Amino acid sequence: EERMSVWERARRRGRFLEQILEDKRAELARRRRVLDEGVLRLQARMWPVPIPLRAVFPDPPTSPRPVAALMRAAPFEGLLRPTYDPVGLALALAAGGIAALAVMTDARYYQGRLEHLAAVKQALLRRRLDLPVIRHDFFLDPFQVLEARAFGADAIWISLAMLSPTGLQALLEAASECGLSVLAEVRTEEEVERARAMGMQALIAQRRDWRTFTVDPALPARLRPALPESALVLLAGGIRSPQEVAEAAALGVHGVILEEPLLRASDPAAWLAGLGFRLEVFQRREAG
């Protein structure tokens, strides 16, 4: 398949991140030609006020809450769910005690779509479920932030490794204008300092290195002392066992993002229940 052949070429050259950014810039140029900014701004105003991420994470954290990352495929794992139903997954996981949903919208490597984001948010609203929906993508341009809001996002998930200082500033200004929370992925103390200097208060300690796609299980413990005490802190990167959830709890983080292992499970809600989260403390009722 052409998608995977491009990825394979990047893997062989050791240019994972560079290939992703190159492809995303080309995609952005195409999207700007077909999506009118004025129409997106009108769409953005049609959604309810965004749900702040802080609203669903107790502070200080008593136990980490689970966040589900929804995607059909991943470049380092291949196809995760041949029959991918993001709305069905979202509703099953919401009933299972999930705190928030991150919907991957990158098409080239994850087989995502902006329409998946909107469909998930609409389904939650119809059932009056107050779960934040996060747009996960490779953010490079404020236009993507406007897209996120226009398709129902409450928050965006960005990676500092992919952004220049001016690029980060532009994204933060756009998110503030749209009322969106920003989750910033960090892997180094330098990136933590960048986030701190920009006043960012929601961070993801990412165990996966975007340059190699390898996972470093020890990274959160190394990075935790550098993370601001006042920040909302989540962990991500191939978390798959009750032991890893217990380790996250010991670090005092607010949440854990569950990705490929969750999506490979035949019954994701049952798999979630077996991870040892204290879900009974956080079960949400439908508003009424």
Regions found by a protein language model. Give the residues of each.
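Glycine-rich phosphate-binding active-site loops on the catalytic face of alpha/beta enzymes
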Residues: A99, V103-T105, E147-G167, I204-F213, ...
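Catalytic cores of alpha/beta
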Residues: L140-G152, R187-G199, S230, L235-L258, ...
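C-terminal helical cap(s) of enzyme catalytic domains, especially alpha/beta-barrels
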Residues: R222-A226, A249, L262-G288
